Each structure stands twice: as structure tokens, then as C-alpha cells.
Amino acid sequence: MTNGGTDREAPTLDQARRQVGRYGLDVDPQAVLVAVRLISAGARVGRAAEAHFSRFGLSTGRYRLLADLEDCGGEKSPSRLAADLDVSRATVTGLVDGLERDGLVARRASVEDGRGAVVVLTARGAQRLREMAPEHFGRLEEMVGSLSVEERAVFLDLLARVVRGSSALTDE
């Protein structure tokens, strides 16, 4: 993608055709172009999300953890958080450490398993989510505001299919 949010995209379909032809591959250049642009768009949206969440003293990961805790009633084990957020336990530990320092979450012994710990959303963490909600959700709506309701439904379906196909990049 180019800077400044213009509609000009790189690479072009012609460039993808040349690249595929250069290597003598039997792959669809348009499929390659869609994948390359999706990866680029994902990186760009990721950078925008980090800038967005930094307004609230958070990162994307820290926000996702807080929102996940709020959605499940306020507490969850670190291993469950890792599974639900699709990140490693080490990542959860780092996120929780920072959120705990800021008073947004706390660790406590599990009632179900005295040996284990759970991460708990604090009142301060819940307040942070409430305070940021109007701006946060307003900006999310604005981000996809140029899409009609029907286009958003199609986009969600297409996105789910692409995400399922993303294992092609990680499979051995």
C-alpha cells in the first residue's frame, strides 16, 4: 500500500503476473495479488490499531485481554486467556504483568484450583473499558463506514474463509 491512504496499491496485477511468470509457476497471479494485498492491509490495520489503542494507554494485545475478561464475567486462567486470544502463555504473562502494574487486572488464587491462578479484571480496568468505549466503537464503525450492511456481511464471510486458509502459510 502506498502512504497517505490513497487507492493506489502495489503490487499491481501486472506485477504479480510478471513475478509468477519469472519463476515459471503454475499459480493464479490474482490469487497471489489478493494474498499479498491482504498481508499488507493487515499490517497497516495493525499499525493503525496500535496508534488507536495508545490513546488509551493500551496496546492491541492489552485491550483484547481486558475485553476478553470483561466478556467472560471478569476472570479467567492464564492458559484459557492464551487459548482464547490465540497467543502463547508467555505473551499472556507479559500482557498481564503490564496490566497488573497499571492496576487494570489482578492475579489471585483460583477458587476451583488453589494451586492455579486466575486473572481478574479490576474496577479500574472495567472503568478504562467504559471510558474508552464511545470513542473506540465510534472509530471502529468509521473504519468500515464506507461499506454497506450487505458488503460488511459479505466481507465477514470472506474474511472467515481467508483466515481458515491462512494455515497454508504455516503448515509444514
What is the meaning of each model-derived region?
Residues 90:
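Key DNA-contact positions within bacterial/archaeal DNA-binding proteins
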Residues 62-66:
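Short alpha-helical "packing" element that flanks the helix-turn-helix/winged-helix DNA-binding module
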Residues 72-77:
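Short capping segments at the starts of secondary-structure elements
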Residues 1-56:
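N-terminal leader segment of winged-helix/HTH proteins
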Residues 54, 83, 100-101:
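Alpha-helical residues within the helix-turn-helix
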Residues 97-157:
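Charged, amphipathic alpha-helical coiled-coil/dimerization segments
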